[in-house]
Design a protein with these regions (language model features):
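Extracellular-facing segments of soluble proteins and assemblies that are Gly/Ser/Thr-biased and enriched
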Residues: 139-232
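C-terminal structured interaction module
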Residues: 277-309
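Short helix-loop boundary/capping segments
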Residues: 200-272
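Ser/Thr-rich, Proline-interspersed low-complexity disordered segments
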Residues: 30-50
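Conserved small/polar residues in nucleotide/adenosyl-binding loops
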Residues: 310-317
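Solvent-exposed N-terminal domain segments of exported/luminal and surface proteins
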Residues: 49-175
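Bacterial N-terminal signal peptides that target proteins for export
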Residues: 1-7
Length: 317
């Protein structure tokens, strides 16, 4: 590079350093204002803790009671959109079983009626050692005529069990069979003034059923035998659909109802007019007018009820 080129480059550098400006050096220079401090953000409020389920079992209760009831605090409850969780408290004293509940299902709630899901505090008290009436005649059938509505017991999760018929509305299903009319969820319940069950799905009321969708969620392939699903208002237990004949541990049977569908009838309306009770001889298999029978069983009760497999007539689509 020759001297002329060096001078040119140097001159450019000097002009660049001077900025080419022509400002008045005597002008006053304003001080730079101090920056405005950023506002302190408000603290983020702690989230409201989600409600949790409650389960309390009295240590004084006998072992078969402790085994019968499910720990609903381990279940997910009716769903995030419902600000409620199941509560179940069981105690035993003075020869009685006392159950307190808020009537909230432990599984996802699926609306099947116009009624909202609400918490409703309930208390049920039944004898720990119920006895059979000396007359051995049903004491409550037909108390309100042929219509059997309302409280007929409670489940092992603290839900109402209602009778086999619905109310008088809608007219085309008045006093009909809610299973046949397809107005129950997959666990056999729906809402009125409170959530309640008209039917049982054993998958929802066994120790493996404490999930969001127990009717369809995978479960171990277990054949539940003489499982207590709930209790009647007299204190006798309600077993599931399988048991051993005479508690022999060998001969597995599925008890059957002695009510038979009358030819040409269906239980869409006035379900009680669609069936007739036909007494059978084999009392190990066929149940009495209250859907129960007497024989030895693993839980020590002489008499007990059964929920049954729903086979006929086929429920409506």
């Amino acid at each position: 590079m020759n001297l002329r080129n060096l001078i040119t480059v140097f001159s450019i550098l000097i002009l660049s350093a001077c900025g080419g400006g022509s400002s008045d050096a005597s002008a006053a220079i304003s001080p730079t204002p101090a920056p405005t401090p950023a506002p302190t953000p408000a603290p983020t409020p702690a989230p409201t803790p989600a409600p949790s389920g409650v389960y309390e079992m009295d240590e004084n209760c006998p072992s078969h009671i402790k085994e019968a009831f499910l720990d609903v605090s381990q279940a997910p409850g009716p769903g995030d959109q419902y600000n409620m969780m199941p509560r179940l408290q069981v105690s035993c004293s003075n020869g009685n079983l006392k159950v307190n509940s808020n009537s909230v299902p432990h599984y996802s709630f699926i609306p099947m009626t116009p009624n909202d899901l609400v918490e409703r505090d309930e208390e049920w008290v039944v004898p720990l050692e119920p006895s059979i009436d000396s007359s051995r005649e049903p004491t409550n059938i037909g108390a309100n005529g042929p219509v059997i509505l309302g409280y007929m017991g409670f489940t092992n999760t603290g839900l109402f069990i209602f009778g086999p018929t619905e109310g008088g509305q809608p007219a085309n299903q008045a006093y009909g069979d809610p299973v046949y009319n397809n107005i129950l969820d997959d666990c056999g319940g729906h809402t009125a003034f409170a959530y309640h069950n008209h039917a049982f799905n054993t998958r929802c009321f066994n120790p493996n059923g404490l999930t969001a969708n127990p009717a369809t969620d995978p479960q171990p392939e277990v054949l539940h035998i003489s499982l207590i699903l709930g209790f009647g208002p007299d204190g006798f237990p309600i077993f599931n659909e399988y048991e051993y004949a005479n508690n022999d541990g060998v001969n597995l049977v599925s008890p059957q109802s002695s009510f038979e569908l009358i030819d040409g009838q269906n239980p869409q309306r006035y379900a009680f007019d669609a069936y007739e009770y036909v007494e059978k001889d084999n009392l190990e298999i066929y149940l009495d007018e209250c859907n129960g029978h007497s024989h030895e069983n693993p839980h020590g009760y002489e008499y007990h009820y059964h929920c049954l497999l729903y086979t006929s007539p086929s429920p409506r689509d």
